[in-house]
């Protein structure tokens, strides 16, 4: 393994239709990835892909906070639990799940309920918490400090500033295993806050991701993103941290193996 994409959506269009072509590129560059679900349907697809390509992919199963209103809590819990218990060896994380107050706060109660349900599932099956957190980092800090997860926590698509990074890092002081997954946003010229935050995040806590098909890094910004584009994100991380590319690649792969593989 030369590269790792901690969070992609090969289980969603337009990537799903062409996933075999993308996986050929995985082999060319030494890439492996987590294919992450956002609802029950594409979580099952993620598992199917991981089963078909166990040398390249692991699955994440979960319900995105912006979709919680579409599901019955108990039914979703039963479906996810069956999925995990049946296919545990192909699954690396629960998620993406979390909190998102960016578009609406109409579903805060449901987000809280689905958060706790998926949190408990990750703890029960000893899986990584793949967290989606948008416009609510103070809340996630309080919740994690109270719940004290024993399993590692990954802040997916981390794109916040230095103060937020430093505060979340203090969770390690109370025994939490937190990691930061850096998206292609870090390659954007206007991502100064994230670039500054990267300087305070220890290399041993870093992961790289694409969140493809979204958030394509420079030089593909504005186009469809693909997991193999993670190479540009990793290069930028190395440039910002002013360390050799080989060192960053090795560190990220080491972290990925420890958490997911």
From Swiss-Prot:
Q: Supply the SUPFAM superfamilies for this chain.
A: Metallo-dependent hydrolases
Q: What class of enzyme is it?
A: hydrolase
The EC number of this protein is 3.1.-.-
Q: Which residues bind a divalent metal cation 2?
A: 96, 132, 156
Question: InterPro entries given for it?
Answer: DNase_TatD-rel_CS, Metal_Hydrolase, TatD-like, TatD/YcfH-like
Where do the annotations place a divalent metal cation 1 binding? 7, 9, 96, 211
Provide the leader sequence positions: none
- Which top-level group of life is the source organism from? Bacteria
- Molecular-function GO term, any one: DNA nuclease activity
Q: How is the cofactor bound?
A: Binds 2 divalent metal cations per subunit.
Q: Which keywords has UniProt assigned to this entry?
A: Hydrolase, Metal-binding
A single GO cellular-component term on record: cytosol
The cofactor(s) it depends on are: a divalent metal cation
Q: Which family does it belong to?
A: Belongs to the metallo-dependent hydrolases superfamily. TatD-type hydrolase family.
PANTHER family on file: D-AMINOACYL-TRNA DEACYLASE (PTHR46124:SF2)
Q: What is this protein called?
A: Uncharacterized metal-dependent hydrolase MPN_009
Which species is the source of this protein? Mycoplasma pneumoniae (strain ATCC 29342 / M129 / Subtype 1) (Mycoplasmoides pneumoniae)
């Amino acid at each position: 393994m030369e590269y790792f994409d901690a969070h992609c959506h090969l289980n969603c269009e337009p990537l799903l239709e062409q996933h075999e072509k993308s996986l050929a590129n995985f082999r060319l560059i030494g890439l492996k990835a987590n294919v992450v679900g956002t609802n029950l349907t594409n979580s099952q697809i993620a598992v199917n892909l991981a089963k078909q390509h166990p040398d390249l992919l692991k699955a994440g199963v979960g319900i995105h906070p912006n979709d919680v209103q579409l599901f019955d809590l108990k039914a979703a819990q039963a479906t996810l639990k069956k999925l995990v218990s049946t296919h545990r060896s192909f699954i690396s994380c629960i998620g993406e799940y979390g909190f998102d107050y960016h578009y609406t706060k109409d579903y805060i109660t449901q987000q809280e309920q689905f958060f706790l349900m998926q949190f408990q599932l990750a703890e029960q099956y000893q899986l990584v918490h793949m967290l989606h957190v948008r416009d609510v980092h103070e809340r996630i800090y309080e919740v994690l400090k109270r719940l004290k997860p024993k399993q590692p926590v990954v802040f997916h698509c981390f794109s916040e500033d230095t103060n937020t990074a430093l505060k979340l890092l203090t969770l390690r002081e109370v025994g939490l295993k937190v990691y930061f997954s850096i998206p292609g946003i870090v390659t954007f010229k206007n991502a100064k806050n994230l670039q500054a935050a990267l300087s305070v995040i220890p290399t041993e806590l870093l992961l790289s991701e694409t969140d493809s098909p979204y958030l394509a890094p420079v030089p593909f910004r504005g186009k469809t993103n693909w997991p193999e584009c993670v190479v540009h994100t990793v290069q930028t991380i190395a440039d910002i941290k002013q360390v050799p590319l080989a060192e960053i690649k090795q560190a990220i792969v080491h972290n990925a193996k420890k958490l997911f593989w």
